[in-house]
Amino acid sequence: RVLPQGTQDSALMVLAAWPEVDDQRDGTLFTGPAGPLLDAILRAIGLKRDDCYIASLAVTRPAGGRCDESDAAELDRLLRHHVALARPQRLLLVGSDMLRLATGRPLADVRGKLLDLNHDGGKVEAVAIAHPAMLLARPAHKAAAWDSLKLLNRGR
C-alpha cells in the first residue's frame, strides 16, 4: 500500500491513478527514475514535494496496470471525495490513466489547457501531464507537459 503524503490546503495536489511498481516497493509515490523528474517539474513551477499533497486514487497497483470499467466508476467517486478532503489550491493530474478517470478525455485533448475539476466541495483548477516515467521514455512529450505546467503559475 502506498498512502498519500502532504497536508490539506496545499498549493498543489499531485494525483496519479495508482502507484508504479517502484512506488509499491518503496512505499512512496514517484520513486525510481520518475522521482527526480517529478522533483524537477515541481521546481520549475516554484514548488517542492513538501509544498504538495501527493496521492494516488488506488493505494495499490491493479493487476496489469489497468482497471476495468466497474472499478473506474468507484475510482471516480474516490477522486472527487479525496480532492474535497485535501482542499488543494490547484491540481496536477499525472498520467493518461489519471486523466481518463478524471475527465474521460485523452491526454492529447487537454495538453496546454486549464481544466476545472468538480468535486464534493466545489471545483478546483487542474492541468494534466504525462507521467514522468513516460516523459523519460519519450522526451519529445516534455514540451507539451511544460505548456500545461505553465498554466499552474498563472495568477501566482
Regions found by a protein language model. Name each.
Residues R1-R156:
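A polyanion-binding, active-site-adjacent surface
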